[in-house]
């Protein structure tokens, strides 16, 4: 049976909770977002992040860089931000030649949870930074009264950003869903999704 989740209502609840938590901190958290190039979708995502950060009291700094930046310059910036910021996001997509910089972010500063150490912890069921979208999906499930324990969940897509981390989170002890991970080569996808 289908159930529509009121994501806006839940987001507002979470925002209220975060605002309260941040207000109790002696120093507000500092987050830097690094954008490379002029992708319109990236600009839109960053604007939404900046607005949300402002509403809860997080200090966000946007570093907008040319797509012509070289890896050495980018690594220097990331090294500097690793020392001064509480969190760091490299807004994707970025040129393939610069992707190695994601491993340069200190795992504890890796807000997106893309660093191989954080993904490795996720595989092992060890606490660490988790990719935001999968973590948000789990939070939505629980807050909407949809406990996945013992249920069969079909995840469509196996990206390292959403699908694979989500399937790992769902199957961890404490969440305990049975997961089928479908992808572009899955036969009869519609049959899996109807289950």
Regions found by a protein language model. Give the residues of each.
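Short, ordered loop/turn segments at secondary-structure junctions
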Residues: 36-38, 65-67, 93-95, 106, ...
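Glycine-rich phosphate/diphosphate-binding loop of Rossmann-like nucleotide-binding domains
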Residues: 38-50, 96, 128-195
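Short beta-strand segments enriched in small/hydrophobic residues
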Residues: 28-38
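Short beta-strand elements in bilobed, periplasmic/extracellular small-molecule ligand-binding domains
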Residues: 53-67, 177-181
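Short, well-structured alpha-helical segments in soluble
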Residues: 73-84
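Glycine/small-residue-rich loop that forms an oxyanion/phosphate-binding "nest" at active or ligand-binding sites
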Residues: 92-135
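Periplasmic-binding protein-like
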Residues: 85-93
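Positively charged, low-complexity intrinsically disordered leader regions
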Residues: 1-27
